[in-house]
Amino acid sequence: MIEKNKHMILYHGSIDIVENPEIRIPSRSLDYGSGFYTTTSYKQAEDWVKRKLNSNIQVGYVNVYEFDENLLESLNALLFDSPTEEWVDFVMNNRTNKDFNHDFDVVYGPVANDKVYAAFALYEGGIIDKQNLISELKAYKLVDQYLFHTDKALKAVKFIEAKEVTL
């Protein structure tokens, strides 16, 4: 059961201050499809910003938000606590099936980082099966991500501040 008045802090790394998050259609396939991605890990958001910085873009931001978890009860949410067969199928559908779409307001689960991409490549290539992929992924310390897929879900996200990031 969700605790009443439970608020979570979420982070979004960007080269911009994002006071009013929007649903974005990505130019490449992402783990959970289109929307607005956040994480509970400040470091994950900061690392994402640092990968975008270069001689032309010298400043980025970790945008900080508050999310009212009580609102999850009124949203169509898909929650993955760890890598599972269902999570693998969901991520693979989002990444490889251009016609795949889902109607969840919020999706929560592990983020597929570089180590995870390598393991997924082995799975896609038929080198390992789904169970070996899941076992491999459970050995990693995976960071989480929240995808807000609908405007209804984004209404539960309130901007707090933006923290500057430089190299």
Predicted segments, located by residue:
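Conserved NAD+-utilizing ADP-ribose enzyme module
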Residues: M1-K6, L30-D31, R51-L167
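Extended catalytic/binding region for NAD+/ADP-ribose chemistry, centered on the ART fold
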Residues: S27-K52
